[in-house]
Curated annotation (Swiss-Prot):
This is Phosphatidylserine decarboxylase proenzyme. The keyword Cell membrane applies. GO terms for cellular component: plasma membrane. Its cofactor is pyruvate. It comes from Cereibacter sphaeroides (strain ATCC 17023 / DSM 158 / JCM 6121 / CCUG 31486 / LMG 2827 / NBRC 12203 / NCIMB 8253 / ATH 2.4.1.) (Rhodobacter sphaeroides). It holds the Pfam family PS_Dcarbxylase. It is an enzyme of class 4 (lyase). Is synthesized initially as an inactive proenzyme. Formation of the active enzyme involves a self-maturation process in which the active site pyruvoyl group is generated from an internal serine residue via an autocatalytic post-translational modification. Two non-identical subunits are generated from the proenzyme in this reaction, and the pyruvate is formed at the N-terminus of the alpha chain, which is derived from the carboxyl end of the proenzyme. Heterodimer of a large membrane-associated beta subunit and a small pyruvoyl-containing alpha subunit. It is found in: Cell membrane. The gene is psd. Its main location: membrane. Belongs to the phosphatidylserine decarboxylase family. PSD-A subfamily. The active site is at residue 190.
Length: 232
């Protein structure tokens, strides 16, 4: 029972966090030598750093055609928008679903659906609050185009935020991805935009809490109209 309880709190850590946790741990040892109360503050910060870089296992639905959330967080925007020009996906608007991650969310990013990466495009930019509408256009971003088995395309865009200053993308053009597979992360608060294929409606609502790799964001085969919801 004790082991089960520990597993609830202790999660695997993304390798990107190893150096940061090591630095925090060394600084903590120095703080203990200077003054013990400072050392305990360092312990708390080290634990927080480990928690930030956690990379928990997720149970991804495997039915063909399901699009899952690429990030933990809250749905902040659902609107028509043209995908980033650097992806070469054309000028036609697509339904964009934005998931905002705060500093307490897990920041590992996952593929919303299986397919082949056809383009990866990084663009430098500003570091505005990622929850703002204009962050999609003005902020630093890294965009991916994924071609599905039926030939349709979906776009996923990692957007840096006010605190987030480091976008990590571990895939390149030609990389095959499975639904829910890890492809990168953004450090310290940010946003993920998903551009859905034409005619596909989101099955999530504004303000809904999302779990990356698990929450179904849309269904390619569903005729259901866009959902609405209310906070209760």
């Amino acid at each position: 029972m004790a082991i089960d309880l520990l597993s609830t709190f202790i999660k695997p850590m993304h390798r990107e966090g190893t150096k940061f946790v090591a630095i925090f741990a060394v600084v903590t040892l120095v703080l203990f030598l200077i003054w013990e109360p400072l050392g305990w503050i360092g312990v708390g910060l080290t634990v927080w750093c480990y928690y930030f870089f956690r990379d928990p296992v997720r149970v991804t639905p495997t039915r063909e055609g399901l699009i899952v959330s690429p990030a933990d967080g809250v749905v902040s925007l659902i609107e028509p928008a043209v995908p980033p020009a650097e992806l070469g996906m054309g000028p036609a608007p697509m339904t964009r679903v934005s998931v905002f991650m705060n500093v307490f969310d897990c920041h590992v990013n996952r593929a919303p659906i299986g397919g082949t990466v056809t383009a990866v495009a990084y663009r430098p930019g500003k570091f505005l609050n990622a929850s703002l509408d204009k962050a999609s256009e003005d902020n630093e971003r890294n965009a991916l185009a994924i071609r599905l088995a039926d030939g349709r395309q979906i776009a996923v865009v990692q957007i840096a935020g006010l605190v987030a200053r480091r976008i990590l993308c571990e895939v390149r053009e030609g990389t095959p991805l499975l639904t829910g597979e890890r492809f990168g992360m953004i450090r310290f608060g940010s946003r993920l935009d998903v551009y859905l294929p034409e005619g596909v409606q989101p099955l999530v609502c504004l303000g809904q809490v999302m779990t990356s790799g698990e929450t179904v964001l849309a269904d390619l085969a569903s005729p259901e109209a866009r959902r609405t919801g209310a906070a209760r």
